[in-house]
Amino acid sequence: VIRYLGYGKQFQDFKCNVHISGRQGPAGIKSVLPGLSPESRNCITIENDEMSWGIDASLELWQDCALVLDIHHHWVKTGEYISPADDRLARVKDSWRGVRPVIHYSVSREDYLVEHCATTKPNYDALLEHGYKKGKLRAHSDMYWNSAVNEWAVSFAEDFDIMCESKAKQVASIDFYNQMYQKDISSVLNNIVDSA
C-alpha cells in the first residue's frame, strides 16, 4: 500500500511504525528485514514497548532502521523520566540518518489518576506503592492534562518531532501545543483547511 501511495522512495518519506514485541524481539526483526521491499525498509520505524522490549533492546536495531522513542512506554517500563541528554538518545537520533527523528508522547489517563496534581509529574514507584496498576498506567489519556509531564515532553522538541498519542487525537494535540507555546494555532489550522 505504501508503494502504491508513492512513498518509500527515500528513507523516512513515510513512517510505518512497528512496536518491538513478540518472543524474538530485536533478533526476530533483524531476521525479517532483508526480506522486506526497499520501500518497506525505507519506511519502517521500530518503537520501544512498555512490557518486554525497552529502549536498550530497540538500540540493537539502530543501524538497521529508524527508532521511535516512546517516552511514556519508557516511563511505564522503568519509572524513569528519561532526559533528552541521555546518551542512548544519540543512537536513536543517529538511526534516522539525518532525517529529523520522532518521539511518541502520551500520559496516563486522567480518569485513572483522578486525585493526582496536574502540575506535578507522577512518581511511578509511589503510584505502584499506593495500589495503582501498571497495566492501567499504560493507557493513553484523552487530553494532555498534566502540565509538568507536558513540559518534560516538550524538552525533547529541540531534537525531535513530537507525535501525540491521545484518545482525543487532534483536539488534544492542539490543546497541548496551545498549553506549551501559549499560542492558539486554531486559526492557522483553519486557514490551512480553508485553502485546501
Residue ranges and their predicted role:
Residues 1-66:
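Active-site acidic/histidine proton-transfer and metal-coordination neighborhood
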Residues 20-24, 48-52, 71-75, 107-111, ...:
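Active-site-proximal loop/turn and secondary-structure-junction residues that shape catalytic pockets
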Residues 46, 69, 164:
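Active-site flanking residues adjacent to catalytic metal/cofactor-binding acidic residues
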Residues 65, 76-196:
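Histidine-acidic metal/acid-base catalytic patches
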